[in-house]
Design a protein with these regions (language model features):
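Short, glycine-/small- and polar/acidic-enriched structural segments
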Residues: 6-9, 13-127, 131-138
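Short helix-initiation/N-cap motifs at beta->coil->alpha
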Residues: 27-38, 91, 129-165, 300-310
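Secondary-structure end/capping motifs
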Residues: 211, 217-291
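Basic/polar N-terminal segments that are highly enriched at the extreme N-terminus
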Residues: 1-3
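Pocket-lining segment of extracytoplasmic ligand-binding domains
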Residues: 142-243
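Long, low-complexity C-terminal extensions of enzymes
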Residues: 274-315
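Short low-complexity, flexible loop/linker segments enriched in glycine and/or proline
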Residues: 63-65, 185-190, 311-314
Length: 315
């Protein structure tokens, strides 16, 4: 008899047909913000897609009640997440210093990566920026995890306003956000910039991770590896569809050629799960999260994930 398990996840092609051995999934497809809010606040499902930033924050606390597995359903390069007001005069990353910059949440994964690359690739001093926190399009968004901000960094909460409104009215000079708040991108032609960044660093930013509620994991620890294997199999079929030239599996022209070119750069498995294929990205993220006060200490990558998923048997 299979184990019944509830899972909240976005409707990804690479999770299509997900059938982990020994598990009957009850899948809930929700908008990302609702999913993260409900799982962070109420732990409504046995397993959930989760913000990587919030995950490392929770894992840095004593006795965390979640257990991540190294499945990364969403990855996005984040040079494209930096937006500037049209009349701000900001032309380079260093121009952000001394300016008012909005964020939806300091612990938003996209922002952690963007601030990390601004700091480490372009020499931007985060403490020299005036940070303002608000919802992207709606007032009232709040931080959902505990922060230990680095020296010199302060954040002004703006609960009655939105980032989009403040950017449009000139009350903010820039916004770092996973969603478009308006304005223009600092890196206007961002694709070649992000491609060179990947070639240089091998960092392919991980946005989301799959986590289990700890009581669910502790009761049946085998589900961690079975879920990982199930996700890997679903992803393998998705990647085959992406490079298929005989059919249009996704309504986008030249998709197979785009996938072929990306595979030439990133390797045969161009969307890897597991720890070792993602080590440059994972090490960079735990460093950024600690430097920016999302975690009070730098986490060890291996300590983030269920032990059963850290190694494989060999014949």
């Amino acid at each position: 008899m299979n184990l019944a398990l509830s899972l909240a996840i976005s409707p990804y092609d690479h999770a299509r047909g997900l059938r982990p051995a020994g598990i009957d999934l009850n899948v809930h497809e929700l908008a990302i913000e609702e999913m993260f809010f409900r799982f962070t606040r109420f732990r409504e499902w046995d397993a959930s897609e989760m913000s990587f930033g919030k995950t490392v924050s929770l894992m840095s606390q004593p006795s965390p009640d979640i257990v991540p597995i190294p499945v990364f359903p969403s990855r996005v390069f984040r040079h494209s997440a930096v937006y500037v007001a049209r009349n701000s005069g900001i032309r380079t990353p260093k121009d952000l210093e001394g300016r008012k910059v909005g964020i939806p949440e300091w612990a938003q994964t996209a922002g952690i990566y963007a601030r990390g690359l601004l700091q480490h690739e372009y020499g931007v001093e985060l403490a020299r920026i005036q940070w303002h926190q608000a919802g992207v399009h709606q007032p009232g968004r709040i931080e959902k995890v505990e922060l230990t901000l680095p020296q010199g960094v302060s954040i002004k909460a703006m609960p009655q306003r939105s980032l989009a409104e403040m950017l449009a009215k000139g009350d903010l000079d820039a916004v770092i956000s996973a969603r478009d708040p308006g304005g223009t991108r600092l890196f206007e032609d961002y694709v070649p910039v992000e491609l060179e960044y990947f070639k240089k660093t091998r960092i392919y930013p991980i946005m989301h991770v799959i986590v289990l509620r700890r009581p669910v994991y502790e009761r049946d620890r085998w589900i961690a590896m079975n879920l990982l294997k199930g996700f890997e199999e679903a992803k393998r079929h998705s990647m085959q569809r992406l490079v298929e030239i005989g059919l249009s599996h996704i309504p986008m022209p030249w998709l197979a050629e785009h996938a072929r070119r990306w595979r030439e750069v990133a390797g045969e498995d161009f969307w890897p799960y597991g720890i070792e294929p993602n080590r440059p990205t994972l090490e960079a993220f735990v460093q950024y999260a600690h430097e920016q006060g999302v975690t009070p200490r730098r986490l060890k990558v291996e300590d983030l994930f269920a032990p059963e998923t850290r190694e494989r048997f060999k014949i």
